[in-house]
A protein has these predicted regions:
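Peripheral, non-catalytic segments flanking oxidoreductase cores
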Residues: 84, 101-108, 112, 124-141, ...
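Residues in well-ordered beta-strands of folded domains
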Residues: 78-80, 95, 135, 175, ...
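N-terminal entrance/gating region of PLP-dependent enzymes' catalytic architecture
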Residues: 1-131
């Protein structure tokens, strides 16, 4: 593909996206195809010659769109809000067009420093103190895993880093409510804590973590010779948008020398409004936040 064809197909694809968005409301929210139906529309063998990108763009309506669940549909209310705007589509285009890898300052200084600017803007927008900074992760799940890894290393004095899971030290434990997002359990497993050392505790009538159950679980684990390591407080659970008592959990974490991670992936954006910040009162005492 040369630059002229790129321009032509790019304009065609932008037009297709705009037209799709304009008629989105008239489409069914969920796809009505059966399992395997989309796959059956494609040939079994790969094409012997490439370069038929114009045909690929033209086939989006016929081959792809029937199998799409329309996450940007005004009647889509499942999972997390994930709507993309025209501006974000253009941002993806610019990022792909530059093709820069931003894993370090040297590989792309602008990527590193723009990320710092964006995180500083976000910090100010949600009213976090100057002690906070951040990085952009590919997902909230990855961010929670990173937080649990940091908690593990702090609690073990980097012993897990050196000796791994076979170091022979007493097991570390993690605590969250039974309403916490599945990424907490997955993160605990990937970080090596194991299901046996993850405590998913009961909630009150508002579906928020009960501090009395948390305190009892921590004390019981200490008595058994285990090492309480991390708490995960949720600001906006996936099921009911419940709010865990961040301030009370922060006090408990400080008392027991534990890492406090706040999962605000669902309701965190509401903190742009000062009148909503009571929802995560005490967040400034957290060790990490997503």
């Amino acid at each position: 593909m040369d630059a002229d064809e790129f321009r032509r197909l790019g304009h065609a694809l932008v037009d297709w996206i705009a037209e799709y968005r304009e008629r989105l409301e008239s489409l069914p929210v969920m796809s009505t195809v059966r399992p395997g139906e989309i796959r059956a529309r494609f040939p079994a063998e790969p094409p012997r010659q490439g370069g038929k990108l114009a045909e690929a763009v033209a086939s989006l309506d016929e081959l792809v769109l029937p199998g799409i669940t329309h996450w940007n549909h005004p009647s889509f209310f499942a999972y997390f809000p994930s709507n993309t705007s025209y501006a974000s589509v253009l941002g993806d285009l610019a990022s792909s067009g530059l093709g820069a890898q931003g894993m370090s300052w040297q590989t792309s200084p602008a990527a590193t420093e723009v990320e710092e600017v964006v995180m500083e803007w976000l910090r100010r927008m949600v009213g976090l103190p100057e002690t906070f900074t951040g990085v952009i992760h590919d997902s909230a799940s990855t961010a929670t895993l990173t937080a649990l890894l940091c908690a593990r290393e702090r609690a073990s004095g980097h012993g897990q880093n050196r000796a791994g899971l076979q170091g022979g030290e007493p097991a570390l434990t993690v605590y969250a409510s039974d309403q916490a997002h599945s990424s907490v359990e997955k993160g605990a497993l990937l970080a090596g804590f194991g299901k046996a050392h993850l405590r998913l505790l009961g909630t009150d009538a508002e579906h928020a973590l009960r501090l009395d159950l948390l305190e009892a679980a921590v004390e019981e684990d200490r008595a058994r010779g285990l090492r309480p390591c991390a708490l995960v407080a949720t600001t906006g659970t996936t099921g009911t948008a419940a709010l865990d008592p961040v301030e009370g959990m922060a006090a408990l974490a400080e008392r027991h020398g534990m890492w406090l991670h706040v999962d605000a992936a669902l309701a965190g954006t509401a903190m742009v409004l000062p009148e909503c910040r009571w929802m995560w009162r005490g967040v400034e005492r957290a060790d990490s936040l997503v």
